[in-house]
Amino acid sequence: MEMVVLVDHAGDPIGVQSKADVHGQSTPRHLAFSCHVVDEQGRLLVTRRALKKRTWPGVWTNSFCGHPAPGETLEDAVSRRAEFELGLSIDHITCAIPNFSYVARDASGIEENEHCPVFIARAVSSLTPNPAEVAEAQWTSSSELKSAIDAAPWAFSPWLVEHFTELQPLIAEHIVEAEDDD
């Protein structure tokens, strides 16, 4: 049974609960993460959530999301989910927005209530998306993604819509830092 870490309003751990029990009509705040993957050309990977996903099926979102297990570091959880959702190896995992939180309700009435740090990482292998998680994947520029979000925010996950404006200037900075480290 997959467990998630419950957190207070400041993002500090206060307990654990099964993932299946956490996501419902009145979801307690819990720890999650979002990750944006960039390639060697500086393009961002966006994915469309699988149609069988319980929340926000079929919407476009960041590269992948997930929940750290109790006792697991966020960076380890990011690496684990990159492999699970995308069959992807990543490096230069950086927490770009450490204090992002959001509450949103999807069309089925399921609420998300997450303290959700936003990461940027670099792809170091090719993609092999898991069809249970990802319906489609596409590489795009940061400016093209911003234009698409502005034109049709309803086609994207609410967490992506909320954090992308803050994230966009940090993406180029991350790419330069990763290149400098090589």
UniProtKB/Swiss-Prot annotation:
One of its GO terms (biological process) is isoprenoid biosynthetic process. It is found in: Cytoplasm. Signal peptide: none annotated. Pfam families: NUDIX. Residues 28-162 form the Nudix hydrolase domain. Its main location: cytoplasm. It catalyses: isopentenyl diphosphate = dimethylallyl diphosphate. The keyword Isomerase applies. SUPFAM superfamilies: Nudix (SSF55811). Keywords: Cytoplasm, Isomerase, Isoprene biosynthesis, Magnesium, Manganese, Metal-binding. InterPro entries: Idi_bact (IPR056375), IsopentenylPP_isomerase_typ1 (IPR011876), NUDIX_hydrolase-like_dom_sf (IPR015797), NUDIX_hydrolase_dom (IPR000086). The keyword Cytoplasm applies. GO terms for cellular component: cytoplasm. GO terms for molecular function: isopentenyl-diphosphate delta-isomerase activity; metal ion binding. Its cofactor is Mg(2+); Mn(2+). Binds 1 Mg(2+) ion per subunit. The magnesium ion binds only when substrate is bound. Binds 1 Mn(2+) ion per subunit. Mn(2+) binds at residues 23, 30, 67, 112, 114. Its EC number is 5.3.3.2. Catalyzes the 1,3-allylic rearrangement of the homoallylic substrate isopentenyl (IPP) to its highly electrophilic allylic isomer, dimethylallyl diphosphate (DMAPP). PANTHER family: ISOPENTENYL-DIPHOSPHATE DELTA-ISOMERASE. HAMAP family: Idi. This is Isopentenyl-diphosphate Delta-isomerase. It comes from Brevibacterium linens. The gene is idi.
